[in-house]
UniProtKB/Swiss-Prot annotation:
It comes from Moritella abyssi. Optimum temperature is between 23 and 25 degrees Celsius. 37% of this maximal activity could still be observed at 5 degrees Celsius. InterPro entries: Asp/Orn_carbamoyltranf_P-bd, Asp/Orn_carbamoylTrfase, Asp/Orn_carbamoylTrfase_sf, Asp_carbamoyltransf_Asp/Orn-bd, Orn/put_carbamltrans, OTCase_ArgI. GO terms for cellular component: cytoplasm. L-ornithine binds at residues 158, 221, 225-226. This is Ornithine carbamoyltransferase. It is found in: Cytoplasm. Its main location: cytoplasm. Inhibited by excess of arginine and by the bisubstrate delta-N-phosphonoacetyl-L-ornithine (PALO).
């Protein structure tokens, strides 16, 4: 593994190895406290962040490395100077680049013109670090993730894409339940389906919540993706039937709940569920750090 732009670039064994390493780092942090000693990692943010920034900054520190934070004060990458020059300069100073960007093309430019590993910490198409944290969380409750049935409910987006691709590679069943007109990208769904054929997994897209009865895990996200300035009130009528609430859990028999956050309580998910016995949401947030640490350790070993 030279970079992490999308989980579709990883094999099943590579994903399983990352999950195993994340568990090892989580269980024995002292053993890895100097694993990145002498390493400097530039973290770039074109978009706002809480979980991504804090988990990367603290995670890198816990591994003995040094994180350098760059925000969008100089504009998006490629505006003040070319992506080529930006990547070439950063590569002379840093050991890796972690980038949360508006466009996936920016990440491809960083890889093309840089000479250090690049990690996608979110873009318009994918959110691979989130998906790895999600399946790390799932694997803590299900010994064989290939037998897990995961339902994503809401708007098809970058998180949906990465969940589908990761589940497909691992051999799990992943269903995206989205209102009509809000399905995930058709080309990425096609890619996930092709990967599932190889692994024995299954990828589905539906608008019917009855299709996820007896699933294991349900996953929510905001109804309006970051960068979309559509008022929530405008989409509330469309998405409200897909709210993750106690009634839906009882109707489907689903045991565990995930949400990548930030969450709009009483909209896509109720507080009763988010704070309830079925919720793994804050374990999931913690696991962002451990999954990302595993990625950095693998890239910089």
């Amino acid at each position: 593994m030279e970079n992490l732009l999308s989980v579709k670039d990883l094999s099943k064994q590579q994903i399983l190895d990352l999950l195993a390493l994340a568990k090892a780092v989580k269980a024995n942090p002292a053993e890895y406290s100097q694993a990145l000693a002498g390493k400097s990692i530039v973290t770039i943010y074109e978009k706002p962040s809480l979980r991504t920034r804090v988990t990367f900054d603290i995670g890198i520190h816990k591994l003995g490395g040094h994180a350098v934070y760059l925000d969008a004060q100089n504009g998006a990458i490629g505006e003040r100077e070319t992506v080529k020059d930006f990547a070439a300069n950063i590569s002379r100073w840093a050991d890796a680049i972690v980038a949360r960007v508006v466009s996936h093309k920016t990440l491809e430019g960083l890889v093309e013109h840089g000479s250090v590993p690049v990690v996608n910490s979110l873009c318009d198409l994918y959110h691979p670090c989130q998906a790895l944290a999600d399946f790390l969380t799932i694997s803590e409750h299900y010994e064989d993730v290939s037998k897990v049935k995961l339902a994503y409910v809401g708007e098809g987006n970058n998180v949906t894409h990465s969940l589908m691709l990761t589940g497909a590679i691992l051999g799990a069943e992943v269903t995206a339940v989205c209102p009509r007109g809000s399905s995930p990208d058709a080309q990425i769904v096609k890619q996930a389906m092709a990967l599932a054929e190889i692994s024995g997994g299954k990828i589905n897209v539906t608008d019917n919540l009855d299709d996820i009865v007896d699933y294991d895990v349900i996953y929510g996200d905001t109804w309006v993706s970051m960068g979309d300035d559509t008022p929530l009130a405008q989409v509330k009528e469309k998405y409200m039937p897909y709210q993750i609430n106690k009634a839906l859990l009882m109707r489907t028999g689903i045991k565990h709940v995930l949400h990548c956050q930030p969450a709009h309580r009483e909209l896509e998910i109720t507080s009763e569920v988010m704070d309830g016995e079925h919720s793994l949401i804050f374990d999931q947030a913690e696991n962002r750090m451990h999954a990302q640490n595993a990625v950095l350790l693998t890239l910089l070993k």
